[in-house]
Structure formats: structure tokens, C-alpha cells
Amino acid sequence: GKNTWRKEAYPYYKANRKAGRDKSGMDWNALFQIMNNVRSEIKEFFPYKVIHLDHCEADDIIGAVIHEHGSELNIGSEKFLILSADKDFIQLQKYANVDQYDPIRKRWIRHDQPAQYLEEHILKGDTGDGVPNILSPDNCLAVGERQKAMTKKRLALYSEGTQNMDEETLRRFYRNKMMIDLSEIPQKYQDQIRAEYNEEKNIGREHLFNYFIQKKLKHLITDIQDF
């Protein structure tokens, strides 16, 4: 949804994305409108749960659902497949019933130490999302400044715990933890997401045929059983 809670908490979140869109020359408003229409039609006609909430991103929805339904033991638990190349989701692989597949490169994304990966991700930041490492000021990526280097020695020191951080580094650590750790989603949004997810959806497949006819999707009609 628009106006994400991360942007409200940290104004530099994804700050360079808009600049990149402005330079591209693409009509992004038209593209977003098309995406919104497609999402609405999937919600109306397809037998799938579609969750879309203002102030939340897809990461929030996936994170909140999996933190509720994730299981340490892979025994009789509902299985979850995250279809995304985004390595932010590696942290959710701490649950035995969670797997991740990259549909672009057609490969599994798996990590033996998801908790350690998350810890290092927080310390190093996420440049793609405009989140610097914990040694660098909030605005450094937005204004194009170099980050202070996170050397292996510093990484090892800070991995031992927050007791090794001064006050400003500690503040930046919690800044990054809020942006990156999917267990840090504000409770009110977690509750909204889970309520939507757990709501029964009674749309069967009977609407699909008419939808495909209406949209002239003849090539999909022959594969309707796959939906």
C-alpha cells in the first residue's frame, strides 16, 4: 500500500527509488494503475487470497503471516513457499515449513544460518532500500555520500552484541532493525494482516471461465485446471 509505515518512521527509506523513476521516462502512474486493476481482478475472480493494506508492503504481509504460522518443526505444519528473489526473506527460513524460490533465475534460495544472515543484514544495511550500515548517518545514501566501511573486524565486534556499540551506533542499529527485521512490523499492522489472511474466502473456480472469455484469454482456458 501507499505511504508505508517504514517511510513514515525513516524518511530516507527507498529515497532513491523515486529519483530513478523520474529519470526513466516511463509513465509510472499508468503502470501502477494497471497493477492495481490486475490485483483487484485477481481478488474478485480468482480463488486466491489477495491482501493489500495501506501503509504495508508485500514484505510485511509475508512476514506477518509466516511469523504467525511458521513452525520450528516441519511436522504436520502448513508449508509456505515464498516466490521471490528478494534475499530479505532469508530470515524467515528459520522456520522449517518455509522455503523460497527465485522465479526469475529458476533456483531455490536457501541459507543454513538465517538468524546470522539477518544479524549481518542489519549491521550492513540494505543499500537497495536506502538503509545504510550502522556506522553511517541516516541520509548518506540519499545524498550520495560514501558509507563508513563495515570491515570484517567491526562486523565481528558488533556481532558479539549491542554492548560494543556507542550511543549513536546503537540508535542506527535499531533504525536498521526496524527497517529490515520482519518481526519488527508494528503490532497494529500485524493484526490487520493476520485478520485479512485468516478471513475465509469463498470464491471458487466457477468465475474463472467467464473471466477468461470476457478478457479474451483463450490460451488460458485450455489450462484452467492449473488455476
Task: List the model feature ranges, each with a label.
Residues 13-16:
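C-terminal catalytic or substrate-handling cores of phosphate/nucleotide-
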Residues 225-227:
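Short, amphipathic C-terminal "tail helix"
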